[in-house]
Every structure is written in structure tokens, then in C-alpha cells.
Amino acid sequence: MKIDHMHREDFKMKIYASGEDYLETILVLQKKLGMVRSVDVARHMGVSKPSVCVAVNTLKDGGFLTMDENHFLHLTNEGRKVAEEIYERHCFFTERLIAAGVDPKTAEVDACRIERAISDESFSKLKESVNNEDKAR
């Protein structure tokens, strides 16, 4: 299935929020561990191995993920693109909430909620506004 040039909203409709969580988790674990297996994802997310198996198969079918003969998970170009967009939003909101005085654990949870709720346009404008404020200091 070829999905090039789709907008983020189209990705969201295709993989839903839980799929985004899995992609983001795989990206984070790849940065931390290098190679990632389903069991690593299950531990990190606190979900069952069968749940990860279902998600992995869905993401593989959608063209976001592959699994090699050693059962290591690899993001496709499209999967990496989605994961990096989600991760960028997550980091942005987590940092801003912590800077505003929110407890780091609460900031992490709230950032997850915000990153899905905000539109691409609103996120882009907000990020631009914050960057302009930072430059003015």
C-alpha cells in the first residue's frame, strides 16, 4: 500500500492514536537501544505482548513498520515520518509544560493528550510563536 504525500490527518485516520503511540515508542526505543523487539515495546508501554502483536501487524499492513527475520522492528520511511512528528509535538509540549511549572510526570501525560488534539496548523503557529519569543529574548 503506497501512502506517500498523505497529510498527518490522513495518517491519524489510518492508524489512530494507539498506532501513533506504538510508532513513537518504537522511535524512542530505537534511539535508546538501537534494535527493538515487540517485547521491548510491551515493557515500555506496559501492555501485553498479544496487544503489541496486533498493533505490529496492523502497522506492518499499513506500511509503517517492518519486522526482520530476527523479529526486530524497523520503521519504514512513512512510519519514521509519523513517529518523528508525534515525538516532536510530545517533546515540545512536555518542555513547555515543565517550564510553566507542571510536574514532569503530569507534563508527560498531558503532552500525550495535547499532541493528538492539536491540528497541524495550530501546532505550527504555536511553535512559530514560541520560537519568535525565544529569539526576542
Where are these regions (language model features)?
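N-terminal helix-turn-helix DNA-binding core of bacterial DNA-binding proteins
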Residues: 14-47
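C-terminal regulatory/oligomerization modules of transcriptional regulators
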Residues: 2-5, 109-137
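Basic, amphipathic "hinge/linker" alpha-helix immediately C-terminal to the N-terminal HTH DNA-binding motif
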Residues: 71-89
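N-terminal positioning helix adjacent to the helix-turn-helix/winged-helix DNA-binding module
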Residues: 18-21, 37, 78, 89, ...
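DNA-binding alpha-helical recognition surfaces that contact promoter or target DNA
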Residues: 24, 54, 109
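Arg/Lys-rich, alpha-helical DNA-contact motif
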Residues: 87-121
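Canonical helix-turn-helix DNA-binding module
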Residues: 38-69
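Short, Lys/Arg-enriched N-terminal segment that forms or immediately precedes the first helix
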Residues: 1-14
